[in-house]
Amino acid sequence: MSESAWSLHSRLKEDTIDIGDLPLSKVLVIKDAHYPWLLLVPRRPDAVEIIDLDEVEQAQLMTEISRVSRALKEITKCDKLNVAALGNLVPQLHVHIIARRTSDAAWPRPVWGVMKPLAHDATEVQTFISALRRKIWLG
């Protein structure tokens, strides 16, 4: 499928900050300072499930999940990573990668619906994004 027909779902646009593109996926930061929380969104029109990607794209997505997860873990020094493709509210395929700490407000439960989203401090989120870009794209 052509990437040119692809566009980011409106809810994802509203709830995230775009930090760049990997070969398959757009990398986004969720606008919630409670958790270091990233999304990978494969730029494939009509992809709802991972099985909607062909085998090469599925392998590329796993490579990107590993790359971004490793960067997030190194930057945050988190206790646990949560990685999930749920899509119950947004039908566009996207993968959540969330750095969790045993001290966070939702631990050990899932993060959804536990706390009202907290806006990021502008300086802190830019520092975080810069660190992510260095780790993800420069290794």
Regions found by a protein language model. Give the residues of each.
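HIT superfamily nucleotide-processing domains
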Residues: M1-L93, I97-G139
